[in-house]
């Protein structure tokens, strides 16, 4: 059965994730993280993209992107993923050794309200949740750290958010959030399902041909059961 064509109109904000194939580690040393950040920067120069957030983890990464034009998200991700794959394989003497990524990137649109703030917090909190650091700003390979360093070379990649950043944002990121918020994000990650209030989600599902993402899968009904399966995504 052919896979569905991805629809990603401009003006919406998207959470984007991709994961290394099998047990590969994408980022083994600082140079690997820096190389990916360079590709991200070059992608923004080729295809204008508002980058709201990112976090690079040892075997996967998260981006929060806000494209202006229809088709930009797909073009941006295609160039970035292909370029990173080519450079990674060259740097690790792995040319011709199979796929670097599990497949095409996962993504879901986010309503630009408290749901977006929840996703931004989720992304920045990733290394804390995985016990890599005690504070999100300590993780060098994410936008939370970059914002704290005015002279950071990646600071120019960051764009403003659609809404004001809360004054106590860093404290919010580093505090334990609501289980239900994180569970809903896990479901959206697992299913590529729009994230927002019920009316917005249904409207986006129809508009973007994502109605199949709202249907329960077999006996997995409700976010508590789905998140059990999706819990390793982080």
Per-region residue spans from a language model:
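Short Pro-Cys-Gly-centered "Cys-loop" motif that presents a nucleophilic cysteine in a tight turn
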Residues: 1-57, 66-234
